């Protein structure tokens, strides 16, 4: 990562701090108050020792300074605790806001774009990388101001009693950030490489975990174990590289801090021996002046040491921000959002004229398309993989942008509110997604307010009731992660029940019977055929045998509809559909 990129990312990180600017300012103020209390502590301690040792004042006469010293200790501890709480709140507030922006961006991109990267990579981006920015906002940014203000405050406090000690501290302080910067230049790049390795490892591991059964069947288990081991070793090496830089910068910090404090101690030692006679304004070096300087010397460097500790939080945040900023600024041709709403819940009419469907990156996925699907009719999209069928479904769902005209009941789809339009849709895909905890919750996902009678009707119509008695807790059975406790056919029937429970104007089916056994396929298609008679329906399928009752079949190739008609006509026409049907029969 070059310097200009690091500066650009640092500016971006600072721009995000305005989200919680008030809390960050309070954190800085509390840090400054803590610095004042440190000076007060040192002054009380120095004066008490001066009175007791040099002036032989009885301890009873020093009760008030002792009491004030104890109160100062207690007050400083409370201020430090409060500052930590405020800093944590600021970091948490900013993290939540950035995560919300990322999730909104993912929603704009849509599922078609998200599927281009492994789920593990997205998890790393949304969770780990954003969380790794916390210390930058909670600690590093407030500490930047304190690393300047508190040392200057301490120098101002020491200067009236001994200017030589103040100059020693003032002269050695700039060496620390200078050498820290030299060491830390490679830290951000190391962290960036570390995050890339973590994202690859997360995606690699999650994909292999999901495909473990397939890998074992084909004898690839040992090879994939070695692949994961290699990726883990690469991540370990990159992590150790980051830690090596952290320990090196800590060593430099401690060296210069110890050297500076030692110089102050040597100066006062020789001054007390009478070997040095400067720095005390011709009044002699007092015990109070020496104690004040020596007590405050470590505190002078403490803000710089804290900044050095948190500097790696900055490097970590810069590394995390690299892919985040790239993702947030990637131009996406996301669908335009309108405000219009469909007034009716009746089946819809869909019309397309010179329709071109584009990906979020602006690439044409399908088109030109010209068709009309009257209200209440059922259309089937067939064609080879990659011909643009799923792209049309994604465009109708509002997940892909388009050029040309795509009208719903005469209203351009881009003029409709996406949230309002999707309330008129029901969807069943080839890979059922059941994110909720129980079977009941997954069916009620779209309509949490549905009655028990409506729920039972949906379960009956989708043939879920057929296997429900076999489940240990019936409809309240936990389905597990990725519906692990259900077979593929059972999970698909649950997805169908969810679609049937939600009254809709347009039913979209994306290969709903793919990968199902014969019995499950029969049950799923029976339920969907019955449901499709009550609304406009568009189904994508590769199974061409049972399409005789559908109103129209559209054959897609290279993003275009090249043939359309009823099953009886197309199957004997000798065209593309007849060719697909012949290939399908050969496969069977």
Swiss-Prot record:
An example Gene Ontology biological process: cytochrome biosynthetic process
Stretches of the chain found on the membrane's Periplasmic side: 158-161, 271-276
Residue ranges annotated for the ABC transmembrane type-1 domain, each copy included: 20-306
Main location: membrane
Function: Part of the ABC transporter complex CydDC that exports the reduced low-molecular-weight thiols cysteine and glutathione to the periplasm. Export of these thiol-containing redox-active molecules may be crucial for redox homeostasis in the periplasm, permitting correct assembly of various respiratory complexes and formation of correct disulfide bonds in periplasmic and secreted proteins. CydD contains transmembrane domains (TMD), which form a pore in the inner membrane, and an ATP-binding domain (NBD), which is responsible for energy generation. Conversely, a more recent study suggests an alternative function of CydDC: authors suggest that CydDC does not mediate the export of L-cysteine but rather reduces cytoplasmic L-cystine to L-cysteine. The principle function of CydDC would be to maintain the reduced state of cytoplasmic L-cysteine, thereby providing an important connection between sulfur metabolism, oxidative stress and resistance to antibiotics.
Complexes and interactors: Forms a heterodimer with CydC.
UniProt protein name: Glutathione/L-cysteine transport system ATP-binding/permease protein CydD
